[in-house]
Amino acid sequence: MIKDTTFGNKDGFEKFGKSFQEKLCKLIMFDRPFADQMEEVLDVSFFENKALQELTKLVFRHRTEYSVHPSEETLETLVRTEISELPESVQATIRNFVAKAIGNQVVADSDYIKNQALDFCKKQKLQ
């Protein structure tokens, strides 16, 4: 189940930085087994950026509704059709991020990012 806190979370991914958070979102988008693990422990408010929060929720919502991870094509369609209620700046950020991510799915340091993110989320969940 996706957790979403309205007021954000001081104890989020801020300390890891923007690049880490973008790579983490990219891994959730394209690495189904990793997304399975993260869906159990991730509070999307851990992301500093509203666009990354909304994109992650979009992926998880699709997985919940259809019991399958979205393909690249489905993800592009979801971005075109499911984010219209968001502010235009957030929509533009999501569209740009997804286009760049699909163009280059390689994530440097993916094992490190996966381990750090899972460890962090599990520790937060225990608090």
Give the role of each language-model region.
Residues 1-120:
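Noncatalytic partner-interaction/assembly domains of nucleic-acid and motor enzyme complexes
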